[in-house]
A protein has these predicted regions:
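Helix-turn-helix
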Residues: 11, 19-53, 57
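Amphipathic alpha-helical packing segments from all-alpha helical-bundle domains
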Residues: 117-143, 155, 182
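Hydrophobic alpha-helical segments that form the core
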Residues: 101, 106-107, 151-170, 183-190
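Generic hydrophobic, amphipathic alpha-helix propensity
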Residues: 8-17, 33, 58-62, 66, ...
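Amphipathic C-terminal alpha-helical segment
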Residues: 93-96, 140, 160-177, 190-198
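Hydrophobic alpha-helical connector segments
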Residues: 57, 71-101, 153-160
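Short hydrophobic clusters on alpha-helical segments that form packing/core surfaces
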Residues: 12, 16-20, 90, 164
Length: 203
């Protein structure tokens, strides 16, 4: 019985992540998962619990291993640099793998059944956390003079998230990295600047 657990947990999570990334939560069957991981269903149950629990583990892995550019970008000195880095990171990630393009945060919950509600809620919460961290970063940018005093940090954060969502959808539809980066540059062309940013340009 114990031999059913003799597989590499990390490799199994990575394989499951790729399947969920490609097919979404409800589009992924246990057959898909067992074929991708090479692990029988009882062993998957034993190691991870049910499909929902496995997806939540995958979501953590996705953030830590693939979405790490997002928290790193928040440390950059100006809000424009923050957003530019996030857009570049998203464009690269969303087109990195031909077999599973787009973003797990966006495509993971494209489903309608009540059974998927906990997954939708987890993904909504993950996106909300990202938006909150952006809003807080933009508030700091206002205090530093990097953004205008009348800039609406909540609207700017929502704008960035909306662009990211659109990029993910377009990547899934086949847009190239170059096209996504061009879209990002267009979005950045409207980015507001505060007194400190303007004085830096003139000096």
């Amino acid at each position: 019985m114990g031999r059913n657990r003799e597989f590499d947990i990390d490799q199994a999570l990575e394989a499951a992540l790729c399947v969920f990334w490609k097919k979404g939560y409800e589009g992924t069957s246990y057959t898909d998962l067992t074929q991708a991981t090479g692990v029988e269903r009882p062993a998957l149950y034993s190691a991870f619990g049910n499909k929902e629990a496995l997806f939540l583990r995958v979501l953590d892995r996705y953030y830590n291993h693939y979405h790490d550019f997002f928290p790193a970008a928040l440390e950059l000195p100006t809000s424009r640099e923050v957003v530019a880095r996030i857009f570049r990171g998203a464009a690269e990630l969303q087109t990195r793998y031909p077999d599973h393009k787009g973003c797990l945060y966006v495509h993971g919950d494209l489903a309608g059944s009540d059974d998927a509600e906990p997954i939708r809620r987890a993904l909504v919460n993950a996106r909300a956390e990202g938006e909150t961290s952006l809003r807080e970063r933009f508030e700091r940018a206002k205090q530093e003079g990097d953004l205008p005093e009348n800039a609406n940090s909540s609207v700017l954060a929502a704008f960035v998230m909306a662009v990211l969502h659109g990029m993910a959808v377009q990547a899934k539809a086949g847009f190239s990295r170059n096209m996504l980066e061009a879209v990002a540059e267009q979005a950045l062309s409207t980015w507001p600047t505060g007194s400190s940013a303007q004085s830096g340009k003139s000096s």
